[in-house]
């Protein structure tokens, strides 16, 4: 037998050489060995032994029988194939049933599914389970036929019902005990997998009685002979001997109850065996009237790309390396969607794993997206930028870069660095209750004309204008300041600037798109590129956050932040376990609805940092979780996370906690002067119960007890007075009259408190080149020692909250370290080093020279880089770092975007990372100009 078999193999090689199979039906010969379970009870082994076996248990079909890294098991019941199971070692199992149900570890999963190097998907009507790492492919078709393919690495290393894969059919019937037998039932029964839960019965061959009429038997016999006589099958005779298939077909005639379709499984198996050898038998199904059944709306084809077009892949130009297979596919022009064929206009869209029908819309920030042809078509409006400070000096820039900077000084948070129309400065101090922590004590804002005043938002919720405390709400032209929740304030200036300040250190700064690309400071430059967020006043991007933060320091007498701990948990092991467990709520199902809208990872890092850095980690935990919940609420996802035993919020007497309340028109004052421009937003906090309003004492009262605010005066309920012969009376917080006159000015006067106290430093004399400055008592905007100019802050605006007398550098000179220097002698700074005027540095492909304290750089467009590091770390062209532990192959970069036909594509994937016996490696595939290059370590 071997010489004949070898001759057939050599002939197959010759016929598949380049140019040998050029016409219709040619297909590259597969390099994988194939085992098939088909028909009612037939098995075709890797070495092409065919036999019958009707099992009633679980049996080993194939696997790694040397190191036992994986096993493929067939599950039978009453002679019927029920499904396939794959076991990886002793602790992982996945089960695929003929009906498409999938269980992994006892849990239902849906396709597609990837885990531990295994990929489960639906392919042309087949359920396919494959693994490049383990070297196998298993398929179950719609008729319950099984196909198992093994790579040549398993040559002579497998065992089970599919044989031993060594090209010798003579030793295929080797039992689990190692003996050879000629009885297929003795062989197959030996591979039954009994367990304590399931004892496998020994299966016997069925009876051989014939229940088919002679006339039908003749018709079936003639159909079996088609394998030898029909021209459509004759094309493959040189590659696959039809005799064993004809013999098998004839043997099953008496046992089959499906009429003229009884031979069809054998004919299908012959066609698949030919395709395995590289020969496609187009038309065999029609010629033999054996076209396999397909789901409604689909049609059978002898050659279908396994990378079939679906609604989800409509916008992706896939790279398909696998050969075509026979199976069910959609008619030309239609796409597969969840098992049915549809027109492209019927394709749904997917967002955050949830499908949306055609025409559905979503709001994303300030834009609206509509589902069309499986793609989201979105408006392209520029959205407001948000800069956020939370917890222990955690920042989120306008371009969503998260960082921590714990310097103690006054810093420029954000400024219009083109027109200088506004500035926002923060003051940070050591926290009073925790000397190791840094808190934001106040926020100072300088607004555009005609105000030109300094507004200070103080710790505790107070507000000062040019050093004088003012009463809230404050409404002056475009400027509006109002209380939102408890001690929280909201400052609005027109529609372009908004500040939310909670009075305890949490700050949100929102700017309209008119400022995009125009800002500078700790919040970044608002240009959509995270890579240049650490831009300094000198014009260079710093790699270290400490150098970046120090460059925006406004006061000369503050120490630079030299180094800050990247992970306080490493310094406080006692709190590490508590931090990990407590902060895990952010990634728990409690916040699952928000994960697709706001990534929890930066907030999780901040939570661990704060809990470990805080003297009372539990208090900081609640603030950290609240910060993430607030970010979710801003994206329209409201999470009720507080519980009586976890971070319960204690409200003042008479107020109630609301997870989502509105700040608008909740006070007695708002009854007299409703704020029609208030933005209805969702805020967590303490509110008066429905029907009650907050009075000036902080108590919740019914409107009948609210005073009235009229013409700058306060009137108690039921007060009556005469105004120009009109009788006016106060009722329900509103001044009523016999006429319809307006109820006075909508702009309450600022209530001034104690006058600004001027601080001074006693100095009898100043040594040259210092000069003495004495603050005038009659000028609240005077500047003194607190505004000392240095080489680093010379171009930054000083916001004085109180003049300090003392010694300052003479005109034309500035302070550098502890000496006075001429302005033109100031150095430039980069990466913590000083550079003298005229010095040069190289930044990417540009050259920068130090001139007038700033770096003057060439403006070449430099090459950008995207990195894939380790198993799951990615660094985009624009500097975004993210974690994605996907187990499939993904497009790393391509220029096949939109209607662009494209010229290249780079794919990335990890292999062997879930196999203990294999080395994990990264594979990069480069497709360019019709060529393919693969790189792997």
Swiss-Prot record:
Locate the TIL domain: which residues? 294-347, 651-706
> What does the record list as GO biological process?
blood coagulation; cell adhesion; cell-substrate adhesion; hemostasis; platelet activation
- Decide whether keyword Signal is in the record: yes
Residues that make up the propeptide removed upon maturation = 23-762
Spell out the post-translational modification annotation for this entry.
All cysteine residues are involved in intrachain or interchain disulfide bonds. N- and O-glycosylated.
One GO molecular function term?
A: identical protein binding
**UniProt xrefs under PROSITE patterns:** VWFD
Pfam families on file: C8, TIL, VWD, VWF
- Where does it live in the cell? Secreted; Secreted, Extracellular space, Extracellular matrix
Give expression by tissue. Answer: Plasma.
| Entry's Gene Ontology cellular component terms | collagen-containing extracellular matrix; endoplasmic reticulum; extracellular matrix; extracellular region; extracellular space; Weibel-Palade body
Q: Where is this region: E1?
A: 787-832
Give the glycosylated residues.
99, 156, 211, 665, 856
Q: Which Gene3D superfamilies match?
A: Laminin
Q: Which cysteines are joined by disulfide bonds?
A: 35-162, 57-200, 387-523, 409-558, 431-439, 766-807, 775-803, 913-920
Q: For site (Factor XIIIa-binding), what residue positions does UniProt give? A: 410, 414, 605
**What does this chain do?**
Important in the maintenance of hemostasis, it promotes adhesion of platelets to the sites of vascular injury by forming a molecular bridge between sub-endothelial collagen matrix and platelet-surface receptor complex GPIb-IX-V. Also acts as a chaperone for coagulation factor VIII, delivering it to the site of injury, stabilizing its heterodimeric structure and protecting it from premature clearance from plasma.
**What is the name of this protein?**
von Willebrand factor
Origin species: Bos taurus
Name of the gene this protein is made from: VWF
